[in-house]
Amino acid sequence: MERKGRERKLPGMKIVMPTPVETPTMNLEDRCLIKLTNESEEIEIAATDLVVLEELGKGGYGIVEKMQHRQSGIIMAVKRIKSSINDQSQKQMLNELDACRRSDCCPQMVRFYGAMFREGDVWICMEVMDTSLDKFYRHAYKIGKHIPEPFIGKMALSVIEGLNFMKEQLNLIHRDVKPSNILLNRHGQVKICDFGISGHLTNSMAKTVQAGCKPYMPPERIDGETKSAYDVRADVWSLGITIIEIAVGTHPYANWKTPFEQLKQVVKEPPPKLPMESGFSVDCQYFVKRCLEKDYNERPKYPELLAMPFMEQARNEKQFSMARFINEILDTVWRR
């Protein structure tokens, strides 16, 4: 007689699905309530009450203008974005709104006031800064000034602290660190902006490859074999390129004519470094060298960078005044 084997019940397996990142929603009107500081009272701002003072910048996303509120005299930067260009642009806009809304307690990120909808555009209202790093360093070199090491250290410290806040508190990677997205004001503050292409991190990795400005991209985002995923160390590379650019007055890579030239120069050739004769300290040169490690596994993340001697010097530097230097350059340029 053939015995039938008993069916063995497998132990129950609990499948844990990752918590999906919520997609920010947009429910805007043609007016919004804003607070200039955490302590100030809310003021209602209507789009029709804003007067354009000057254009601050423009790009594929839209335009940034300096505006003034008629009734209160409040001046702000307003980023006007077409809300219905395409799905990708709308996603970028929602990313920016989401990041801005959650960044209020970070002094190294441009302060978000509010957002409103006006004639097919989304208006993102932010604090106005006095200049961007790309305009600033070019102005400085144009009038015969160079960018001193203490400035570079304090700028890098602010940027890393802002990026670290994005990672730890917002679970975001910026993905477009470059001089035009680093803003300065006459008080000596340095803040990062433009979170439109920032990406959510899954297990500390970002998966979208097309976001960002190619001249500042690290090897792992260009090389076809490795660009499927990357982490915050991609922004560390971009910061290293930014530091060299403002330190020597020009981007460390020549202009690329073809994608192959970019692949060859960034992926295949040694990384750029500060010239030995530039007069920068050993700690500064080592910091930049570590930011530009070709193998991202060897490249430090934010906590390690913040613990380096160059950052410690920037923290403790008391003689150099960011505000004084920024005002000196801006005043000289505007007098010409």
Curated annotation (Swiss-Prot):
Q: Known activity regulation?
A: Activated by nsy-1-mediated phosphorylation.
For ATP, which residues are the binding ones? 56-64, 79
Concerning what turns on (or off) its expression, the entry says: By B.thuringiensis pore-forming toxin Cry5B.
List the catalytic activities from the record: L-seryl-[protein] + ATP = O-phospho-L-seryl-[protein] + ADP + H(+); L-threonyl-[protein] + ATP = O-phospho-L-threonyl-[protein] + ADP + H(+); L-tyrosyl-[protein] + ATP = O-phospho-L-tyrosyl-[protein] + ADP + H(+)
State which Enzyme Commission number(s) the record gives.
Answer: 2.7.12.2
> Keyword set for this entry?
ATP-binding, Kinase, Magnesium, Metal-binding, Neurogenesis, Nucleotide-binding, Phosphoprotein, Serine/threonine-protein kinase, Stress response, Transferase, Tyrosine-protein kinase
Q: What does this protein do?
A: Dual specificity protein kinase which acts as an essential component of the p38 signal transduction pathway which is also composed of upstream effector nsy-1 and downstream effector pmk-1. May phosphorylate pmk-1. Downstream of CaMKII unc-43 and adapter protein tir-1, plays a role in determining asymmetric cell fates in olfactory AWC neurons during neuronal development. Activation results in the repression of odorant receptor str-2 expression in one of the 2 AWC neurons. Involved in resistance to pathogenic Gram-positive and Gram-negative bacterial and fungal infection.
Family statement drawn from the similarity comment of this UniProt entry: Belongs to the protein kinase superfamily. STE Ser/Thr protein kinase family. MAP kinase kinase subfamily.
Indicate what this protein is called per its UniProt record.
Dual specificity mitogen-activated protein kinase kinase sek-1
Lineage, broadest ranks: Eukaryota, Metazoa, Ecdysozoa, Nematoda, Chromadorea
